[in-house]
Amino acid sequence: MASRSLCSDPNCLFKVDWFFFHLSARPVQIKKGGDRMISKSRSTLQIVEEQVRKWQYTTTGQKAVKPKITVVTISREPGSGGNLVAQGLAEKLGLDLFHQQVIHEMAKSANVSTRFVQTLDEKAMNVLDEWIAALVDDRHLWPDQYLQHLMRVVGIIGQHGSAVMVGRGANFIVPPEKRMRVRVIAPMAFRIKHVATTFKVPPKIARRRVVRTNSDRRAFIRKYFNADIDDPVNYDLIINTGTTGIEPAVDAIIAALGRSKDILRQAA
């Protein structure tokens, strides 16, 4: 019997992953001091232009600050509720939330990459380019056009900070001094039940979807970052939501960061 081949096209991998975005990321508006969260309900162009305006506003007259953690990246096992953890964290800390499908859509567009570049000064852009070059060299990557745009888009979001980024290998792209890398996991039985209950599908189908998506995410990280998505050394904090639940998981991340008012803030 022929085995199912994993699609090498990032768009194909993304289509499979889309199901699990819907698993725990219903159209939710997280209020952030009057700002809107980075939501899938708006077009990519609208999201980009809104974010660019916000960055331009917040950086005007901003004083230089020492590097510190300004981004939380969240990798998650399918069905573990990682998207809910990301949403809860963004809500409690007042951060921009970039879901994996938004990052994916941005990375597909050369125009988005160019537009984002315009939000950084030459010095900041040079620093980012040097970091990306070092990342490519250290991990022996062969970046295609998609990965080039992905690294630039995620890197620029990381430079501006005050963000939670879900998936797309963001934990490998954002420089160490700027991010905390979180991995959300749960037992297989928990994840199957979560999927089956949420989508009202039989456990057999839920299990198939969990296994398939997990395989495709693993293939994506292996292909683009030459890394193992399940390797614990790729994360600073690993949380089992099957044990903790969603809210305690959010609180655990905040506790690990330190006092929330002192973390993930850009000096005005």
Each language-model region and where it sits:
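Glycine-rich phosphate-binding P-loop
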Residues: 74-89
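Short beta-strand-centered segment that lines the nucleotide-binding/catalytic pocket of NTP-utilizing
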Residues: 96-107
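ATP-dependent small-molecule kinase phosphotransfer cores
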Residues: 107-162
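Small-molecule kinase domains that catalyze NTP-dependent phosphoryl transfer to phosphate-bearing small molecules
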Residues: 54, 127-129, 203-247
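Pre-Walker A (Motif I) flank of P-loop NTPase domains
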Residues: 67-72, 161
